[in-house]
Amino acid sequence: MNNLVVLHSLDNTASVTLEKGELVSYLKNNEELIHQKGNPGWRNSDTEMFPIIGPSKENKFIVTTPKGNYNQDQHGLLRELDYSIENQTKNTCVFKKKYAAYTAIENSKFPEKSPIKLVSWPYNFTFKKSIALTNSSLKITFEISTEKGMPFMLGYHPAFMLNGNSNEVVTSNSQEISIPEIQKGGDTAFPVLNTSEISLVKKNGLNLKIQTKGFHNFMLWTPATNMLCIEPITAYPYTGGKMLSKELFNISNGVDVFEVEITPY
């Protein structure tokens, strides 16, 4: 697969760059909206969390399924797989990952950040990430194909660029959240629950509205003032008590589709 894919809106006011399926740039009217890899904060610019969200350390890295117990590290094994390109046009691209049930995958967090060397999952799945850059927005669609009844959690983890002055706010419904408030959330992130829409409001530059289908919740996370992760999630995992209880999991319908639309304004 070509490491870099560059898409352009039909009116040429926006472009998107993807590196091995990772969203590394979204330029709108020459303004960069995505956190740049190598800058302080986070070493990535986006990733997907599947089939779990959050840490499994509290459960000794074990996740219980109807087919038994399997090792999973933080945010699941999907990130350990490589994307291939299914098709591409000027303003669209479809990436795909496939996993064969029970395949042991090397955990990239081992040994520096995790004692678990291999992770696995007892279900086949195909995971598609479709990118469509329109004149007004960036649409990202996730399609998960697997057997009916598979438990799963899904989260999308993009990082957006901030100006470093901590004067941006996040709004959702009647809630207004500052960057310092989000930072106090630490590694468990700041939950914004039971909503499908959220906005990043800036003093300078383009604001962002994020609308979703299928997720219904968000987490906000940043270790720095120059970036912010606004993460659509199916469930907030840091609920106290037993981690990753079965109530946090969706149950597959065979094919499940989730959407994220990012609109600069």
Stretch-by-stretch model annotation:
Residues 146-148:
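Short, acidic/polar linear motifs in exposed loop/turn regions
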Residues 139-143:
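Internal active-site segments that recognize and position negatively charged phosphoryl groups
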Residues 154-160:
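Surface-exposed beta-strand/loop patches in extracellular or lumenal glycoproteins
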Residues 1-137, 150, 161, 165-265:
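Surface-exposed acidic/polar loop and edge beta-strand patches at domain peripheries
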